Every structure is written in structure tokens, then in C-alpha cells.
């Protein structure tokens, strides 16, 4: 029954919130170093690419010819306040830069304080046909419908952030199917705009200095991203032309002991 399912779902959500709430209270080790690393990488993004991608990124930045400082907007798919805590540390202890503005992160799935948004991307991802065709489960389990019903404008704000960005960085994301609308939003924006799409995934490939292997790894990362974003094969070439992979976990690589 739908009511039983939703009750079980609420229990899972509440237990997850309790667990994450406890984790969120734990101290963050070397927070000043983390804040400094984020800032350093944002200013030195070009140096994190392999040579072909570095040249491409440098040409992109030169062609944009933007005056003024760097403004960073963050769409977080996380529930915790970890990033906010690190950014606060950056503002207070890391030497501030007048030309760098990092706006407060927007949590597309909610926070521990205002509630966790959990569920699927659309009705096709609800396997049970009775649930899928009913009223209760779709309205409380399809994430875009929940945001729309809440009417706080968060989806609109995130779309504007994506469409107005010069550089879009995908970091620390699974690129899962339950958020397909956002990956397709990014793919569509990149396909029709003059944007660079930087992709940093957790890289398990063995370090190498061989040029042929580096080229293969970069191409495979682009292909992996297109597949995860559910980009139609006919559009892969367009996405490839805008995508700049960062290999070997160079971006925001934090040397923290387990």
C-alpha cells in the first residue's frame, strides 16, 4: 500500500537525517588548509589540467575576456553544512581576495535544518505501477514535483546559475539517474552556450606520464560523463568539445589521514 511505503520512506529519511546530523557536528580536520586549497585551486585551475586541456582552457578564458573578479556559485547536492563551514573559515582566516566572491551554496535537495529531499527524477523511475499511477507517491517522491509544489524558486535559481555560468565544475558527484534533469540541464546549456564544462571524478586510474594513455583516459572520462548525463549519442561530439576533464583527483585534493 502507498501509505505503508511512504511511512517506511519517512522512517528511512528521518534515520538518515539523524545520522548525518551527528556527522555534521564532528570537527573538520585541517579546515584552514582545506579552505586554502579550495581557494588556490580556483585561482590556479589551468594548472590542474593535462597539457591539451590546459591550452584549451587558457584559450577559453582569453576569449571570454571578462573584466572584474571571479564570482563562484555553488549548487550542492549534499544535505550537510560542511561546505558552509569551510567557506566561513576561508572568509575569516585565509587571506581574502577582493576579486573573489563565493556566494552561499544553494542546496537543491534541502538541508538538515529545512528537511531532506529524497526520491527519483521522474515517474519512469517508480517501478511499482500502482504507485506510479497513483497520487500520493509521485507527489511526495519525485524530486522536481516536490520543489515545484514548495514554490520557493530553487529550481529556477539553479537553472539561472547554470545558464549564466562561464565555467561549470562537476565535482564530488555521482551523476546519478535520480537527478537526470540537472545533468540534462547542464548538457543543454553547454551545448547551446559558450561555456567550459570541467569534470573531476574520483579517479582510480594508475598515474601515468605516457601521452597516449593520458589521451585515452581523458577521452574515457568525457565518454563516461556523456553516458551518465544521458546525452544522446548524436550530441556526444558537442559535449566533448566543451568538456575539460581533470585526472588523478588533482582538483580539491585534500591530504587528510583516515
Question: Model segments located where?
Answer:
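Flexible internal linker/loop segments at domain or repeat junctions
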Residues: 106-109, 114-160
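SIR2/sirtuin-family catalytic core signature
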Residues: 154-258
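Short, surface-exposed, polar/charged, turn-prone segments marking secondary-structure boundaries
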Residues: 101-102, 133-137, 172, 196-198
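N-terminal start-of-chain detector that recognizes signal peptides
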Residues: 78, 140-142, 169-172
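Conserved active-site beta-strand-loop modules that form the wall/rim of enzyme catalytic pockets
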Residues: 104, 116, 166-169
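Active-site periphery "cap/insert" segments of enzyme catalytic domains
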Residues: 1-110, 155, 159-164, 177-189, ...
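Short, flexible coil/linker elements and helix-boundary hinge sites characteristic
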Residues: 21-27, 39, 50, 91, ...
Amino acid at each position: 500500500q502507498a501509505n505503508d511505503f511512504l511511512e517506511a520512506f519517512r522512517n528511512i529519511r528521518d534515520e538518515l537525517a539523524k545520522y548525518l546530523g551527528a556527522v555534521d557536528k564532528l570537527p573538520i580536520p585541517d579546515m584552514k588548509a582545506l579552505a586554502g586549497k579550495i581557494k588556490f585551486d580556483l585561482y590556479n585551475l589551468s594548472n590542474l589540467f593535462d597539457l591539451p586541456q590546459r591550452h584549451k582552457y587558457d584559450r577559453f578564458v582569453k576569449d571570454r575576456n571578462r573584466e572584474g573578479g571571479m564570482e563562484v556559485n555553488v549548487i550542492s547536492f549534499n544535505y550537510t553544512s560542511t561546505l558552509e563551514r569551510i567557506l566561513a573559515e576561508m572568509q575569516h582566516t585565509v587571506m581574502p581576495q577582493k576579486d573573489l566572491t563565493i556566494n552561499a551554496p544553494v542546496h537543491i535537495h534541502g538541508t538538515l535544518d529545512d528537511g531532506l529531499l529524497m526520491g527519483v527524477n521522474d515517474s519512469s523511475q517508480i517501478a511499482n505501477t500502482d504507485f506510479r499511477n497513483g497520487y500520493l507517491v509521485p507527489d511526495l517522491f519525485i524530486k522536481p514535483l516536490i520543489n515545484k509544489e514548495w514554490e520557493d524558486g530553487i529550481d529556477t535559481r539553479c537553472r539561472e546559475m547554470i545558464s549564466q555560468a562561464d565555467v561549470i565544475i562537476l565535482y564530488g558527484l555521482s551523476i546519478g539517474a535520480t537527478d537526470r534533469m540537472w545533468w540534462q540541464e547542464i548538457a543543454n546549456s553547454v551545448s547551446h552556450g559558450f561555456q567550459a564544462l570541467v569534470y573531476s571524478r574520483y579517479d582510480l586510474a594508475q598515474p601515468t606520464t605516457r601521452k597516449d594513455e593520458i589521451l585515452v583516459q581523458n577521452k574515457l572520462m568525457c565518454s563516461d560523463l556523456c553516458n551518465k548525463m544521458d546525452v544522446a549519442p548524436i550530441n556526444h561530439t558537442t559535449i566533448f568539445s566543451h568538456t575539460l576533464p581533470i585526472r588523478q583527483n588533482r582538483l580539491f585534493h585534500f591530504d587528510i589521514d583516515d
